[in-house]
């Protein structure tokens, strides 16, 4: 079973995304912020995909993505970002850091599943 780590400070969104992925047959781990997510990704390098919120306390999703790419154990894990903002500067930073895609919230379940099935390793 492929494992996905969902990182979002909104419990509602985290649960919605986790439920969608769980019902599709993925094993789902959850974290509340980028620092917790980074620790979990490092502890679980067998994660198939990361789904990160951009705007979170403690450590945001872009900072987490950049830190993941610096660690050989997590550098190759595909990452999808979720955001309420579609600013060019955020998209450029996400691309440069190696994000495989991003969604504007609220995320449509069918779009999430299509991307997850394509990217999960």
Residues of each region from the PLM?
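Short hydrophobic/Thr-rich beta-strand motif most characteristic of the beta2 strand and flanking loop
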Residues: 25-32, 40, 103
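Active-site beta3 strand of CheY-like receiver
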Residues: 45-51
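Receiver (REC) domain active-site loop signature in two-component systems and cognate sites
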Residues: 56
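C-terminal output helix
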Residues: 89, 107-116
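Charged docking surfaces used in two-component/phosphorelay signaling
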Residues: 15-23
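Short, glycine/charged-rich "phosphate-handling" switch motifs in NTP-dependent
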Residues: 100
